[in-house]
Amino acid sequence: MGEIVPILHGYIQRLKTRWPRDIVTLGLAALAAGITAVFRWVARQQDLDACTPEFIGLLLLAGILYVIGVFWVERYRLGTAALLIILVSAVLFRVTLLPAHSTPSDDVYRYQWDGRVQRAHLNPYVVFPNSPGLEWLQNPDHPEPPAEESPTIYPPLSELAYRLIETVPGYKRVSTILDLGCVVVLMFLLGAMKQPLHRVLAYAWNPTVLIAFAMSGHFDSLAIFTFLVALFFLVTNRPALSMGALALSFLSKFFPVLLLVTFLKRVRLAHVGLFAALIFAFYIAYLDAGLHLLDGARNYARDWVNNGSLFHLLRHVAGSRVGGELIAALVLLAAIGYLAKKQAPPLLASLVLTGGVLLLSPTAYPWYFTWSIPFLCFYPSGAWLLMSVTSVLGYTPAISYGAGEPLKHSLLMLSLEYGPVYVWLAYHWWVARRTELSPGLEEVGLSAAGTQRQFAE
């Protein structure tokens, strides 16, 4: 009898552990079915402009299901079956969206135009879609690609990729493969950080990520993939490889430069030389543009304002766009210096800086938020999870409030998109002050333990 009691007690304890795990695993399958149903409807639409409210409403619904999934992954110890559901569903979501004919962004047509320009032996940093005599390079299905009055804004590695691909479905497929590559690298990073692999759901199921890459074909996935590879090599103490991958990421999109100081504190001077040499090597093919090499980037910085938040306040305080940009740059530099001084972990610094630049920038398209979403796998900040979901409100059409006036997003949509996030951040800052926490990353709920407590609340 004395031997039976411990055996029964152990059996009951195992049941208590397995029962919620099995229920949550089934729950994840149900969530995946719901998200798939949303994306099947989205992919079947022939004209998203005609059903924008339904499109955004369903994306927000998918976002709610996604957040429930993140909560379960954080709350429960899950097994192999749950991980398989997460990964298989991640592939299924992308396969469902790939055939979509109508997309919420037309950037892929600019990629295609840049690729045609290069195959015609022209320099994309010099010519632009409205250049005289280049009508034959246009896609008749979409004859007006974005930024038709400006040379390209994209760095050389992205441009080389555009040159190798010819069709719009081709761009979407390559973008999606790189996106799935991000899932793989995140799992390696989670393993290196001794964290549960199930946390990859925070990226793999995110609706903003899925719409940006599988549906729209944005090539930010190239920059994110190489950036995550750079971080993996950094945290596993392979500095030369990390700086090489960081250079490739910078050559895809410019945002990884935010983490340059974080990397420099962990590598030798020779590795910095490798970073610079790679950048120069990729720009060589386009140097015949001369002083026009950065014309597109300058035009972007000067003219584009879309879906920003804090920047509008900074511009109002400063009295000009240039003044607002200067304040934003100083805030970012201060954040970079603070994180370097505190020796913040690279993955945490990545979340803070990629998220911070989006809140301060005059332009924050929904797909830009994909830059920061991978780091929710390690620091699942409740406020930023919410931001990753509400960012789809940035797909609402911008309108002009007068003849000749620029297109603007409505104050209502911006308030719905950003307001709850700022309220959440302000609340946690206030709680931190009340409890007299030492000033630091905990104030915004971004410490490793703090984010889990915050999300659980």
Model region roles, listed by residue range:
Residues 86-93, 266-288:
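Hydrophobic alpha-helical membrane-interfacial segments at the cytosolic entry of transmembrane helices
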Residues 2-96, 191, 342-347, 430-437, ...:
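Start-transfer (signal-anchor) and selected internal transmembrane alpha helices
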Residues 183-188, 211, 222-238, 354:
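Specific aromatic-rich, kink-prone transmembrane helix
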Residues 65-72, 164, 169-197, 224, ...:
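Transmembrane-helix motifs of polytopic, lipid-linked glycan transferases
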Residues 79-174:
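Intramembrane catalytic core of multi-pass membrane enzymes that act on lipidic substrates
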Residues 304, 381-448, 453-457:
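Aromatic-enriched
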Residues 174, 183, 279-283, 299-366, ...:
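Aromatic/glycine/proline-enriched transmembrane-helix motif characteristic
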